[in-house]
Amino acid sequence: MFWKFDLHSSSHIDTLLERDEVTLKELMDEEDILQECKAQNRKLVEFLLKAECLEDLVTFITEEPPQDMDEKIRYKYPNLSCELLTSDVSQINDRLGEDESLLKRLYAFLLNDPPLNPLLASFFSKVLSILISRKPEQIVAFLKQKDDFVNLIIKHIGTSAIMDLLLRLLTCIEPPQLRQDVLNWLNEEKIIQRLVEIVHPSQDEDRHSNASQSLCEIIRLSRDQMLQVQNSSEPDPLLATLEKKEILEQLLSNIFLKEKNESAIVSAIQILLTLLETRRPAFEGHIDLCPPGVNYSAFSVNKNVLAAIQERLPSFHQLLLDPPKTGVMKTTWGILDPPVGNTRLNVIRLIASLLQTNTHSINEELIELNTMGVILDMFFKYSWNNFLHTQVEICLALILASPGDSPEHSTISEQNSTGDHVLLKHLFLKCHLIDRILEAWAMNEKRQSEGGQRYGYMGHLTRIANCIVHSIEKGPNSVLAHQLIKDLPTDAQERWETFCTSSLGETNKRNTVDLVTTRHIHSSSDDEIEFKDPGFSQDSAIQQFGFNDEKFADQDDIGNVSFDRVSDINFSLNANESANIALFEACCKERIQQFDDGGSDEEDIWEEKNIAFPQETQRRSSSGSTDSEESTDSEEEETVKQGLFESSTVNHEDKMEVDANEASNWTANFDIPMETAHVASLDSVGSDAWSTEEPLSSKETGWASFSEFTSPINTKETIRSSSPVEMETSTEPVDPLSVNASAQTEVTVAMDAVSDGDEEGENADQMTETVMNGSMKETLSLTVDAKTETAVFKSEEGKLTTSHDSACKYGVVENFDSAMENAPPTQPSSSSQEQRTSEQIVLDGASANGPV
């Protein structure tokens, strides 16, 4: 898309193409020529389509560059030429596929003597492969005209790029009929026979490897094609040719000459393994050591392959005893002379594949040769070769897990023979598998007890022993295996049973991965409810964790949550679960009860709301203030404070509205026991504190007079705050003579409204109100002259009586500061502004709080 829509920046190539004498090399020197070509620059494509330019491009990839050139730029033009020709531009592909002269020039590269230049061979193979893919009819027709094409391919098969070209010819042709024609053509050219001839000791290792890989890929591709096109009328000719008995005999005869060549033997075994390979090997990955049975795939092994291998089993067995000569190998733990070698390892892999077929005749041949005994000897001899141990383990597992001998691949004479599992009997009776396992285990324990190193095969030996136990208990041959254990000598039986219960059991327990908790949890049907799937997506919950802000918690971004499951959640909480909880709730009720109002029992006392008062209450000029730090409305505080100085006209009939039941039920109880020096009982205080009669006369010396104070606030606008007010504890020191440190205190403020300021002896309208002060140490009486608007504080000394009645809920405690006693006398109405300011400060210091 980048090249198609011309999203790249402009280059210098367009400027060069405007010149008449521009050359191909000048354009190839530009860094962005490849990008311009893929973008199908019209001028550039037209320039490259010139006959001389295409010839130069093909020449660059088919001829060796000069030797005297610098190595850094020697293959610059061949590489760019290959990339330009394979840029998948349709015009270039069409011109190459239709111009026979260019194809001949390209084909001439195969006429060079071997070995070919690997880099140029890769360029040639890449260009011809894309032509086969884009122009299959033209290229196949051209190659068929060349009689020596297959010979040249076989000649240069040692070059990997040529082998890739052969495989491309088999895979890149999509039309089924054309592909079938190519297969028939290659089969007629006897390409299979020629590849088999290469697997010969006289050829070099590269030719062995590439020829073997080519044959293996042909087998796999042919079988895959058979699966894809199941209704194909014609079988794959190349696969059918390779599975012929004479071809297989030729392959095996080439490797078993007097001169043993490891490369040729390994390459031939790779071809045989591919022929024996089913669609998916039963033990690929070796996941399950003891499968209940061997699963055969859709591909059945050709009888010709089994017959050809069976004839050469003695030769393969001899390779185990006498492999090709190899040098001495030095390892970290010792010297291997001779080492296992790649030959013997591949022979054991071949035997494992033969055991998977479970053919009776092959099993009989292996028993006669005692091949399994030789393999077991190698298992214990080479204690550190895990490749060998894995293959031996697979062989034993196949024998133990496979059913009786299958007559599927047997001849008519073999079908009349016994159907017993002869190979399993051979393992227990002739190979003495149980005895060898016990001996090796004992040797390892002895070696470890002496401080030696553990044998490297012990892990595989443990798995083999577990496989035997599994086969005896649950395997397809459990009856026969159990009988074979009983047929062992008594001593061997006892040792095996002891080994299974002690050593093997301890090893398995040690190798078992325990859970984090050591306590074994036994599941039951009741646990299903506890392990229900959550009703939300765990991934979305993790991603949304911590994003509580609205811009991160959009409903569209949250995973699909099943809200219907919320109803399934059952919360069963016991209110009396803890005594501490009940005690805490009772304490909270006691502290909040003093703020309760008869008409707002169910309201939230801490909720801020508008307060409406009856008209009768608004006529009174009473207010309370608090210095609490919890207060949030500063204007309300100022209004409450200024309310102390407002004048009001109060009738004699106006009294404090107190509910008798509420007053009697009001309780103030604190956790800390307190002792009061002066406590007034309910009987003595209740009649005086709430009465509207003229208060007792007391000495007024030491108190300020605010006769000239004028309140700027209208009396009618004054309201009485009914909201609960938090008490504030004063930081002033407590007089130890009058107030105990833990005593309950109550401040009584008496406000007297005097109607006639000239007659001091007449009875004046008064209003008294009891207010709880947070300082808990002052008892004050405030008398306000309604006419002259004079406010006088009076101390209530001697008015309160002490009561020791435990039922008393109200207490009045007097506490006077020495500073208050030394206050200046009452000033006339002509007092200065400074005096009124100081008096107002003193007045503001007295905080009056009353019950709601």
From Swiss-Prot:
One of its GO terms (molecular function) is protein phosphatase regulator activity. Residues 828-840 have a biased composition (Low complexity). One of its GO terms (cellular component) is nucleus. GO terms for biological process: regulation of signal transduction. Residues 627-638 have a biased composition (Acidic residues). Transmembrane segments: none annotated. Residues 610-653, 714-742, 817-852 are annotated as: Disordered. Residues 714-732 have a biased composition (Polar residues). Pfam families: SAPS. InterPro entries: ARM-type_fold, SAPS. It comes from the Eukaryota. Belongs to the SAPS family. Regulatory subunit of protein phosphatase 6 (PP6). May function as a scaffolding PP6 subunit. This is Serine/threonine-protein phosphatase 6 regulatory subunit 3-A. It comes from Xenopus laevis (African clawed frog). The gene is ppp6r3-a.
